[in-house]
């Protein structure tokens, strides 16, 4: 092996100290909520994946232990166990110095995720304790750390071994992760499965040893990203078998897989050296550019587009497309835009992906002539639907004259007095009676009320033209005023927050789900920006005493109710709210609309693949997947209504005091 790829003690480079990590963890892992907690695991897992990516090892085991700690074990080369040029044991350098890793300066890896060299030390800094066990050069080595990264032992040789690899076990520090230090099996599962899809020869096992939660899953996909696309499209009506292309250009390896379904939204998942690039980048641009050019050339060749016709827009060509674009870029070419590393900036990646797709796609279209013709016709229909969407957007923009004027005159929208779109809020309220209370109870300056009277359409099943015909959805589109679908522009929104306020019963929950499905599919940037909320009206009102000694309390959960009952003692009256209309305007303001006292749930998309699959399963045409999901996840009891707070996945933002790291 040449020096370029020699994973040794000298290939570990040190850039800076670790002191700031515990003070500002958000800078290193994004947040200290459940996303940040799970990010710790990904940092260590991605180091193991980098070993596999570079041809060392093929197995990774992740185990949630009984005590709540987690272990990540691989069968790679094992971390270097000698003395680093700085004079300290190399293992200690890797786990205690920020930016110490084999990925800086091409010392140990040809390709890697680029940002994961910081991983081990950051995880150590944010852990109550951490232990590392290394199998290398015939020996087993062990070192432990405690209290956020301080070595509690030196590197100790424990015995002999024929294996190679690294095992890291750590317990997150509950003084850093105050919300929870409990790992979620399903969240880890999605991410680990993703890694297995991207590397054909990688086998991953996920174990949960916690009492009452025992579970095990294995991930190994011999057909790689082809199976990834099938997985994403599960439950959807697909139009053809998955197509795959591979090639190399500019020293960059390119893998592409795609499949069309009968839906109206596109889903492109892009990766660089097995790391997800959520914000896309040059590789995604290359894919889209080549696809648009090749499709238009083909459409003209088969005479579906005439000389006088405009080219098809890329958005129309990609309607209903699911694609995975995976590139492997040498370390010296790897560039990201911004600090988050979620957008690729390597210019060579654009031409590499463009070249591979432009080379392979024309042959595929010629070979599948009948399918290709139907895909072109599908794109032409999408173009027509987009024109309708553009018209709706223009109507909304000129609302002072036309559509919005009609909306206002019809008595639906009660607007806010202020024109400050940075502060204004739109409440979507279930029913007229609650809408009346909300109108009277609101702060007129910045809160607008839109009562929903009719049936909200299920936008997962409906065609785009039918969505525009639905009065409730159409009113929402015009009220928000930022367009819809691919033409949605978040900067044009009339409101900083859209708040869904429904009764605390199954009908109210159904309306919430229908509205969230619409926002997720057709106003996704609004959800991604964290600007869609669910209002949380109380379930109970407790009243005791009269006159000046009268005390009124509200409870949002049964737990809060029990606490208040004990606190108030005997002699109180209890009211169970079944609907928003049972509250007078003052009560509705105080409990649900006043920014000083209300509780809101922010709707967030943490994993787009997972979210999209759930929407398809629960809101799509196919009954069997929905039945199976419900039977697996829903416990049926006598009580029909329960608080959304009973869901452990919900994180509540109270009194509008949003933590910087949660936004």
Curated annotation (Swiss-Prot):
Superkingdom of the organism of origin: Bacteria
Protein residues bound to ATP: 7, 47, 74, 114-120, 341
Enzyme class: isomerase
Listed Basic and acidic residues bias regions: 387-398
One function term, GO molecular function aspect: ATP binding
Species, as recorded: Staphylococcus aureus (strain Mu50 / ATCC 700699)
Coiled coil: none
Family: Belongs to the type II topoisomerase family. ParE type 2 subfamily.
Residues that coordinate or bind Mg(2+) 2: 503, 505
Role, per record: Topoisomerase IV is essential for chromosome segregation. It relaxes supercoiled DNA. Performs the decatenation events required during the replication of a circular DNA molecule.
EC number: 5.6.2.2
Annotated site, Interaction with DNA, chain positions: 455, 458, 510, 626
Name of the protein described by the UniProt record: DNA topoisomerase 4 subunit B
Cofactor(s) this protein cannot do without: Mg(2+); Mn(2+); Ca(2+)
A UniProt-annotated Pfam family: DNA_gyraseB_C
Origin organism lineage: Bacteria, Bacillati, Bacillota, Bacilli, Bacillales
Gene designation per UniProt: parE
Renumbered residue ranges of the record's region Disordered: 386-416
């Amino acid at each position: 092996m040449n020096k370029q790829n020699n994973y040794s003690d000298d290939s570990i480079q040190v850039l800076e100290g670790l002191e700031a990590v515990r003070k500002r963890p958000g800078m290193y892992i994004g947040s200290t909520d459940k996303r940040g907690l799970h990010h710790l695991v990904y940092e260590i897992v991605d180091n193991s994946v980098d070993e596999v990516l570079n041809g060392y090892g093929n197995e990774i085991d992740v185990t949630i232990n009984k005590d709540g700690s987690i272990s990540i074990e691989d069968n790679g080369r094992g971390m270097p166990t000698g003395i680093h040029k700085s004079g300290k044991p190399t293992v200690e350098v890797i786990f205690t110095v920020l930016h110490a890793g084999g990925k800086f300066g091409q010392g140990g890896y040809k390709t890697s995720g680029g940002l994961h060299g910081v991983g081990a030390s950051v995880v150590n800094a944010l852990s109550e304790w951490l232990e590392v066990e290394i199998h290398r050069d015939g020996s087993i080595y062990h070192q432990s750390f405690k209290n956020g990264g301080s070595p509690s032992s030196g590197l100790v040789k424990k015995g002999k071994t024929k294996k190679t690899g690294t095992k890291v076990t750590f317990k997150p520090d509950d003084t850093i992760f105050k919300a929870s230090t409990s790992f979620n099996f399903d969240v880890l599962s999605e991410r680990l499965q993703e890694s297995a899809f991207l590397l054909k020869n990688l086998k991953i096992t996920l174990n949960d040893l916690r009492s009452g939660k025992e579970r095990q899953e294995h991930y190994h996909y011999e057909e790689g990203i082809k199976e990834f696309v099938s997985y994403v499209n599960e439950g959807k009506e697909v139009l053809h078998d998955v197509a795959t292309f591979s090639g190399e250009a500019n020293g960059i390896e390119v893998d592409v897989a795609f499949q069309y379904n009968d839906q109206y939204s596109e889903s492109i998942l892009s990766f660089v050296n097995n790391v997800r690039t959520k914000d896309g980048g040059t590789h995604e641009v290359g894919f889209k550019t080549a696809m648009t050019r090749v499709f238009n050339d083909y459409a003209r060749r088969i005479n579906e587009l005439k000389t006088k016709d405009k080219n098809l827009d890329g958005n129309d060509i990609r309607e209903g497309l699911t694609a995975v674009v995976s590139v492997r870029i040498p370390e010296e070419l790897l560039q990201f835009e911004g600090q988050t590393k979620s957008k690729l900036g390597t210019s060579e990646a654009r031409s590499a992906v463009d070249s591979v797709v432009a080379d392979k796609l024309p042959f595929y279209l010629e070979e599948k002539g009948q399918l290709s013709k139907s895909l072109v016709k599908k794109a032409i229909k999408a173009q027509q639907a987009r024109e309708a969407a553009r018209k709706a957007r223009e109507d909304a923009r000129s609302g002072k004259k036309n559509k919005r004027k009609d909306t206002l005159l019809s008595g639906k929208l009660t607007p806010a007095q202020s024109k400050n779109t940075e502060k204004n809020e739109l409440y979507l309220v279930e029913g007229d009676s609650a809408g009346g209370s909300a109108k009277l109870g609101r702060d007129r300056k910045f809160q607008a009320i839109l009562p929903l009277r009719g049936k909200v359409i299920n936008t997962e099943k409906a065609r785009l033209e039918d969505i525009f015909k639905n009065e409730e959805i159409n009113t929402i589109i015009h009220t928000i005023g930022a367009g819809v679908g691919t033409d949605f522009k978040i900067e044009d929104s009339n409101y900083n927050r859209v708040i869904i306020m429904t009764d605390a019963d199954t009908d109210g929950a159904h309306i919430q789900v229908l509205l969230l499905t619409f926002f997720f599919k057709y106003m996704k940037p609004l959800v991604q920006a964290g600007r869609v909320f669910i209002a949380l009206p109380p379930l109970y009102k407790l009243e005791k005493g009269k006159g000046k000694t009268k005390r009124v309390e509200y409870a949002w959960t049964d737990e809060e109710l029990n606490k208040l009952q004990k606190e108030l003692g005997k002699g109180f009256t209890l009211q169970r709210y079944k609907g928003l209309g049972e509250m007078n305007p003052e009560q509705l303001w105080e409990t649900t609309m006043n920014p000083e006292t209300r509780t809101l749930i922010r709707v967030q998309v943490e994993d787009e693949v997972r979210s999209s699959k759930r929407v398809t399963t629960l809101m799509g045409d196919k009954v069997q997947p929905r039945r199976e999901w419900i039977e697996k996840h829903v416990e049926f009891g006598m009580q029909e209504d329960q608080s959304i707070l009973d869901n452990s996945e919900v994180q509540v933002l109270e009194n509008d005091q949003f933590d910087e790291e949660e936004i």
